[in-house]
Amino acid sequence: MKKTLISKLGLLGVISFLSYVAAVTFSPFAYEGYNPLAQAVSDLSAADAPSLMLWNRLSALYNVCETACVTVVCIAVSERKNKLFRTGVYLFAVMEWVSAVGFRAFPLSTSGFANTFQDVMHIAVTAVTVIFSVASLIVIIVAGAKDKEYRGIGVCAAVALTMMLVGALGMKIVPAAYFGVVERFSVFAATGFNAALGLCVFFGGFAFCKNAGQKAGTKTEQARVKEGTSESAEAERENIKNS
């Protein structure tokens, strides 16, 4: 089947994910003394970080493709009957836009937390994105549990939520020397799930489940028609005998 433009644009989520992975992987080489085991990813894009220029180059496609992808997903699911699933996707889209605009407008002023207005706003944006992330993923998980058509993406949402919780709890539990390790569970959860949504759209907008339902419905209808034809034939034979 020929892919529509909407389907093809679903791949923007994968491009966004790869751009983010490249930025997280290679930006530390431009930041002397950066310890990925202990430091947060946001330190790489701090206003005074020596890696800022490289980060901006490598992540150039990250925010653009991420917001474009989640917007495409919203369009793709807008006609779906499952209101709960649509709500979850819309909440996730709000989170992505808040994240893209908020973190670009308020990067950390320096590595760590300097308690400036910019840093406070960065933390506020983080709090909002976390709230919307958790809420959206829970809604999608529930939608997947109730409707088998969305069970696959519901499992992906459960994995993403688990990663977020591991990151959030891990940052409170593990020693400071390993803060960066658990923090990366959280930061990769959202962009990874965004890529998963985009891939679903690319491979038919969850149509594999929809088609399965259509095939089942078609078979049922064919059985009904066949049964009706048999009954009509039997009735006709009875009429002939009686006449």
Locate predicted features:
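Hydrophobic, aromatic-enriched alpha-helical segments typical of multi-pass transmembrane helices
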Residues: 4-33, 39-40, 44, 48-203
